[in-house]
């Protein structure tokens, strides 16, 4: 908790999962008293049944969840997580799990579909430029938005 208090002084948006997964009681305690919003990440991996997602969000009550579609049930699983998070008043964002350009394009389109014009902050979709042997990107970043290139 001391570390979270120190970090909170720096106007940081949030911190991703500060303890290892499978410690729901401790994570719930931290989320209830943290001075810095906590975003669950690894905790969501392998939680694919709707009832378990509901239970996790109800018990832990995080401020945010971070979704990687390839690790969280694909497009449908991600949409379900976002819908449940909204029902619980929990923020969310989508990020890549280091997909190549084809996967990143799909994640970008999913993000646009899920959030539309209601995107509140940056999503983690800038990883496609990390590869040297990637297929050409069909998307480009202009300012703070990602666009599909015209053919």
Predicted regions and their residues:
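Short, acidic/polar
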Residues: 1-3, 46-58
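Active-site/ligand-binding-proximal alpha/beta "capping" segment
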Residues: 76, 82-89, 144-147, 151
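Active-site-adjacent beta->alpha loops and helix N-cap segments on the catalytic face
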Residues: 19-33, 47-51, 73-84, 103
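Flexible C-terminal active-site loop/helix
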Residues: 97-151
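A polyampholytic, Gly/Pro-enriched intrinsically disordered region
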Residues: 61-69, 143-148
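Short acidic/histidine-rich active-site segments
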Residues: 43, 92-99
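Glycine-enriched alpha-helix->loop->beta-strand junction motifs that scaffold or abut catalytic
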Residues: 5-13, 29-39, 57-65, 86-91, ...
């Amino acid at each position: 908790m001391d570390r979270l208090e120190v970090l909170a002084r720096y106007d940081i948006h949030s911190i991703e999962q500060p303890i290892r997964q499978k410690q729901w009681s401790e994570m719930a305690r931290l989320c209830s008293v943290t001075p810095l919003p906590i975003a669950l990440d690894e905790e969501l991996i392998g939680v694919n049944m709707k009832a378990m997602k509901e239970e996790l969000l109800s018990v832990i009550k995080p401020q945010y969840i971070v979704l990687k579609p390839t690790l969280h049930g694909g497009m449908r699983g991600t949409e379900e997580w976002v819908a449940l998070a909204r029902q619980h008043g929990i923020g969310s964002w989508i990020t890549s799990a280091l997909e190549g350009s084809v996967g990143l394009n799909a994640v970008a389109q999913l993000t646009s579909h899920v959030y539309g014009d209601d995107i509140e902050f940056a999503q983690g979709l800038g990883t496609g430029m990390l590869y040297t042997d990637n297929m050409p990107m069909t998307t480009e970043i202009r300012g703070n938005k990602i666009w599909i290139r015209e053919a």
